[in-house]
């Protein structure tokens, strides 16, 4: 089967195409294999909301949940078994992509329990536990970029475990994430780990930034404010890429690179367009640059396949105009630190809520199976 030309062009421009979704249905029907073969998909990301949606639809998980119920498994153990099985199977499906890319792609992400977002020690313990349970080299453990998450990222990288840092909204936090990664690599080197085997991506959220800032611009309501709608998300991500180039062009990283260390690639997340007035491929076509990942919901993936115009690098040379966008936002009264604080709080809360819904639904299923 041939690859879609638009997505092949995106890959050729240095953007790894990952699917922001996973379910047993996708694995069992061959749908994920088809997307790998026809849509240039070379990775998969999951999150609590994705698993909650997967487990609440259809019957694909019923037999396993019933079997776990018969064995007396509690709800946490059940969810851990079910989700790690899916992730392990997806890792195996992407093993060829992992080998072919020397470990850069073919990656599948699984997130630590979102209720641990503000608990460093428990995050570290669960990250190590998930790494051991899934037991695949192409796994990435997702850890949120909260202030408690940062030292956990360093500690987990220091153990030689690959990490996807999630819920990054600001360039300032992105810099702290890159610093945490480098610190982790330095410790891993001291501990004798092979640095070339440690991989990381920094998941920078895009559309949610526009959603929050656009609402505030509409409240201000001036022509100047309204003219800035739909610009912040892309500008923010482009500034993050400039920060990435700076940090990984530094002497500090050069020393680690000499020992085989890899860059921490920026990953554009939250790339489904939420405002119908904007192009549905906006957060893909405007964020093309080498050494990046774009994880897309299937709707966005199909939109790019159908009509996404890939014209090469769309980030190079944009740092000054992107900074100008942020200067204008600040000048008309957008409180940017508050925006990023709200987005982080909402991001953690959203995942906690999905996790709780998943716990409740699974508990209901376990109870029903025991009757």
Curated annotation (Swiss-Prot):
Gene Ontology process terms (BP): carbohydrate metabolic process; pentose-phosphate shunt
Protein keywords: Cytoplasm, Isopeptide bond, Pentose shunt, Schiff base, Transferase, Ubl conjugation
GO function terms (MF aspect): transaldolase activity
Record pathway: Carbohydrate degradation; pentose phosphate pathway; D-glyceraldehyde 3-phosphate and beta-D-fructose 6-phosphate from D-ribose 5-phosphate and D-xylulose 5-phosphate (non-oxidative stage): step 2/3
Functional description taken from the UniProt entry: Transaldolase is important for the balance of metabolites in the pentose-phosphate pathway.
Entries under CDD domains matching the protein: Transaldolase_like
Family of the protein in this entry: Belongs to the transaldolase family. Type 2 subfamily.
Cellular component GO terms held in the UniProt record: cytoplasm
Cross-link (Isoglutamyl lysine isopeptide (Lys-Gln) (interchain with Q-Cter in protein Pup)): 132
UniProt cross-references to InterPro entries, sorted A to Z: Aldolase_TIM, TAL/FSA, Transaldolase_2, Transaldolase_AS
Record bears the keyword Cytoplasm: yes
Name of this protein: Transaldolase
Localisation: Cytoplasm
Gene field: tal
Organism: Mycolicibacterium smegmatis (strain ATCC 700084 / mc(2)155) (Mycobacterium smegmatis)
Lineage: Bacteria, Bacillati, Actinomycetota, Actinomycetes, Mycobacteriales
Pfam families: TAL_FSA
EC numbers: 2.2.1.2
Main location: cytoplasm
Reactions performed catalytically: D-sedoheptulose 7-phosphate + D-glyceraldehyde 3-phosphate = D-erythrose 4-phosphate + beta-D-fructose 6-phosphate
PROSITE patterns in UniProt: TRANSALDOLASE_1 (PS01054), TRANSALDOLASE_2 (PS00958)
Catalytic residues as annotated in Swiss-Prot or TrEMBL: 142 (schiff-base intermediate with substrate)
């Amino acid at each position: 089967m041939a690859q879609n030309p638009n997505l092949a062009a995106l890959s050729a421009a240095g953007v790894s195409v990952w699917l922001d979704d996973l379910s047993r249905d996708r694995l069992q029907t061959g749908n994920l294999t088809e997307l790998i073969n026809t849509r240039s998909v070379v990775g998969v990301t999951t999150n609590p909301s994705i698993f909650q949606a997967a487990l609440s639809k259809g019957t694909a998980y019923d037999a396993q949940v019933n079997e776990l119920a018969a064995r007396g498994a509690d709800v946490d153990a059940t969810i851990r078994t079910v989700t790690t099985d899916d992730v392990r199977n997806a890792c195996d499906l992407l093993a060829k992509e992992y080998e072919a890319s020397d470990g850069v792609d073919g990656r599948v992400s699984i997130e630590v329990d979102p209720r641990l977002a503000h608990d460093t020690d428990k995050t570290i313990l669960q990250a190590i536990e998930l790494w051991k349970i899934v037991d695949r080299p192409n796994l990435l453990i997702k850890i949120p970029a909260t202030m408690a998450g940062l030292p956990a990222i360093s500690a987990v990288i220091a153990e030689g475990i690959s990490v996807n840092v999630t819920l990054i909204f600001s360039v300032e936090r992105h810099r702290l994430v890159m610093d945490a990664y480098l610190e982790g690599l330095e410790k891993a080197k001291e501990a004798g780990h092979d640095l070339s085997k440690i991989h990381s991506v920094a998941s920078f959220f895009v559309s949610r930034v526009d959603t929050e800032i656009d609402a505030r611009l509409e409240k201000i309501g001036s022509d100047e404010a309204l003219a800035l709608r739909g610009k912040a998300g892309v500008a923010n991500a482009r500034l993050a890429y400039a920060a990435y180039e700076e940090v990984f062009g530094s002497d500090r990283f050069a020393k680690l690179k000499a020992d085989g260390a890899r860059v921490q690639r920026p990953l554009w997340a939250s790339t489904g367009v939420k405002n119908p007035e904007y192009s549905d491929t906006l957060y893909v076509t405007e964020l093309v640059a080498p050494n990046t990942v774009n994880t897309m919901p299937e709707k966005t993936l199909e939109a790019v396949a159908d009509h996404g115009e890939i014209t090469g690098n769309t980030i190079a040379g944009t740092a000054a105009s992107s900074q100008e966008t942020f200067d204008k936002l600040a000048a008309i009264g957008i409180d940017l630190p508050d925006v990023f604080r709200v987005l982080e709080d909402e991001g953690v809360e959203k995942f906690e809520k999905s996790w709780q819904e998943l716990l409740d639904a699974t508990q209901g299923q376990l109870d029903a199976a025991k009757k």
